[in-house]
């Protein structure tokens, strides 16, 4: 379990919702639901598990969560998220075939079926349902209420269900299309929650049966009404009108805004987008700017409707978003916007909590590092690394960390000027001297600790320059890597010794970050220099092509391939004479 997960586990709410486990690549590998997100997600990282769960846990590097309004919402959201992301550890539910739907066929005598394959041209589909049992329970209830054709028997042959009162295909004339159309509409209303008409009719039949002393029949109607009530649980995650819409919510705090967008397709929440950024104007104005830019990106599908919070000017949004804009005022639709807003608040609070915890731990790491090395608290740390390939294009780089955080405006790059060939010691000597003689000359801020990305030899060279050549007293430490190029040992002292540093300590993580950052910065600079040198060398020998013209070519064309494909006029446009331009292009043809 890494540090990020440890932080996030402390931030989980005691609310129902869904959680999404991610691997080291950021890929969603498992989607789950929970009545209590805090308890459920924490359980993955506590105690022992079976082999399958251990495999899952071993790959988890991060997780997200979405708060829902009820456990049922969490269940339905889980289904939709699995369909959308197809996580590998949800293998039994990884495609649409795994989810049952209720289908009304487009046949002249419609039938109610359960299917796992969707072919929209063949009928109407309702779902998905979480499992076959649930879908079958709903279908059984529908079969008892709506007398659709139950089998594929010829229409002139009476089936078993006709005698149960559950099939009218034999008794209804084949030409009575209006009857079947009406039955289909009743089912559509029923499955989208608009079942008042059906319940009223059943209550009337129950009362009539009771008055006629047909108590068994009355009990059947009573059970049907009870079954309908069970299915009446309202879902904010599932939109009953099956519309495509985007639902926006936002929350602001401490100068930051979080915008949360729920993407609802065919009435189901399939994905969300979370974006956090500092805002500089009124919150409502910056939100308008955000939503106006949101649909300029071709990646964002424009739905039939966009829901926005009631604090936003609807007309202004309508002016920049070419679809129907809705500010829900009541009921389920308003609750959907409230849910998006709630998740925006939770996400923003999580960001602040993580930042605060990270800051506390980083400051603690700096304190502990100072204590470990027996020096003053190293507020400003400057780290150095060399980079070259067999002595070609040698460079060095310096990064600065202030209070445990990178200060990129203080980063510096160095081209090695006095060293020929691959000599890391001499290169380090040059760079340290150039850096700190400049610090002395310009009276710049001195570091509290210098870190050398290297072993004993390079550290001793740096100490010699600092103490003997420049007369400074600055603590210097070295970071050695192992054969896998990973942070391995901290060297410090006089003489240098390995400082024992627990691999799971905050101090180790801080030093690891510093070493990775200075190495990245040095490597990037070396690649830039090597590329530029390679570019220039290929242009050497062309008469009339001096350094300034080479620089102009590099700036304009970026690479040799682009130059080789250019015309004489394009090259001349950079102020290069026609004769020189022609000679340049001819040199590529010769190759």
UniProtKB/Swiss-Prot annotation:
Domain UVR intervals: 196-231
Pfam families xrefs: GIY-YIG, HHH_5, UVR, UvrC_RNaseH, UvrC_RNaseH_dom
Subcellular location: Cytoplasm
Location of the GIY-YIG domain: 14-91
InterPro entries registered for this protein in UniProt: GIY-YIG_endonuc, GIY-YIG_endonuc_sf, GIY-YIG_UvrC_Cho, RuvA_2-like, UVR_dom, UVR_dom_sf, UvrABC_protein_C, UvrC
PROSITE patterns noted in UniProt: GIY_YIG, UVR, UVRC
SMART domains the record matches: GIYc
Gene3D superfamilies: 5' to 3' exonuclease, C-terminal subdomain, GIY-YIG endonuclease, UVR domain, UvrC, RNAse H endonuclease domain
A Gene Ontology cellular-component term: cytoplasm
Function in brief: The UvrABC repair system catalyzes the recognition and processing of DNA lesions. UvrC both incises the 5' and 3' sides of the lesion. The N-terminal half is responsible for the 3' incision and the C-terminal half is responsible for the 5' incision.
Assigned protein family: Belongs to the UvrC family.
Protein name: UvrABC system protein C
């Amino acid at each position: 379990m890494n540090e990020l997960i440890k932080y996030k586990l402390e931030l989980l709410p005691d609310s129902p919702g869904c959680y999404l486990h991610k691997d080291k690549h950021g890929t969603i590998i498992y989607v789950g639901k929970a009545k209590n997100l805090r308890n459920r997600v924490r359980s993955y990282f506590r105690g022992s598990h079976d082999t399958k769960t251990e495999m899952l846990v071993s790959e988890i590097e991060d997780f997200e969560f979405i708060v829902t309004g009820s456990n049922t919402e969490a269940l339905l959201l889980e289904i939709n998220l699995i369909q959308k992301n197809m996580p590998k550890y949800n293998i039994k539910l990884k495609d649409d075939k795994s989810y049952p739907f209720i289908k009304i066929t487009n046949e002249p005598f419609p039938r109610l079926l359960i299917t796992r394959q969707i072919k929209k041209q063949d009928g109407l589909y309702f779902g998905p349902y979480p499992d076959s049992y649930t879908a079958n329970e709903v279908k059984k209830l529908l079969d008892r209420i709506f007398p659709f054709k139950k089998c594929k028997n010829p229409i002139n042959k009476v089936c078993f269900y006709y005698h149960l009162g559950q099939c009218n295909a034999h008794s209804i004339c084949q030409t009575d299309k209006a009857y079947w159309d009406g039955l289909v509409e009743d089912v559509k209303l029923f499955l989208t929650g608009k079942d008042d008409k059906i319940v009223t009719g059943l209550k009337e039949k129950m009362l009539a049966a009771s008055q006629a002393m047909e108590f068994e029949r009355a009990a059947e109607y009573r059970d049907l009404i009870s079954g309908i009530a069970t299915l009446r649980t309202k879902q904010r995650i599932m939109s009953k009108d099956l519309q495509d819409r985007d639902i926006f919510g936002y929350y602001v705090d401490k100068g930051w805004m979080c915008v949360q967008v729920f993407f609802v397709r065919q009435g189901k929440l399939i994905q969300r987008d979370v974006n956090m950024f500092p805002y500089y104007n009124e919150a409502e104005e910056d939100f308008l700017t955000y939503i106006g830019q949101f649909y300029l990106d071709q990646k964002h599908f424009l739905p039939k409707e966009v829901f926005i919070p009631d604090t936003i000017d609807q007309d202004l949004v309508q002016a920049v978003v070419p679809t129907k804009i809705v500010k829900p005022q009541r009921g389920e639709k308003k609750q959907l916007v409230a849910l998006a807003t709630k998740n925006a608040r939770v996400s923003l609070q999580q960001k602040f909590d993580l930042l605060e915890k990270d800051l506390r731990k980083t400051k603690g790491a700096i304190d502990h590092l100072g204590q470990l090395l027996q020096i003053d608290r190293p507020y400003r740390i400057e780290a150095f690394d060399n980079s070259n390939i067999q002595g070609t294009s040698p460079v060095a780089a310096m990064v600065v960390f202030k209070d445990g955080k990178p200060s990129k405006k203080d980063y510096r790059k160095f081209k090695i000027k006095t060293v020929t060939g691959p000599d890391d010691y001499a290169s380090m000597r040059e760079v340290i001297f150039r850096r700190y003689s400049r610090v002395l000359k310009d009276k710049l801020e001195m570091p509290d600790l210098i870190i050398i990305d290297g072993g004993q030899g390079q550290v001793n060279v740096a100490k010699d320059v600092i103490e003997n050549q420049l007369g400074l007293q600055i603590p210097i430490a070295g970071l050695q890597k192992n054969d896998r190029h990973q942070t391995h040992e901290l060297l410090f002292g006089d003489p240098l010794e390995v400082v024992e540093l627990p691999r799971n300590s905050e101090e180790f993580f801080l030093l690891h970050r510093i070493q990775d950052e200075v190495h990245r910065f040095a490597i990037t600079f070396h690649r830039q220099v090597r590329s530029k040198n390679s570019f220039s060398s290929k242009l050497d020998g062309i008469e009339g092509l001096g350094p300034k013209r080479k620089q102009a070519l590099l700036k304009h064309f970026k690479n040799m391939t682009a130059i080789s494909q250019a015309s004489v006029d394009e090259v001349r446009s950079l102020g290069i004479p026609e004769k020189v331009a022609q000679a340049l292009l001819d040199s590529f043809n010769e190759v």
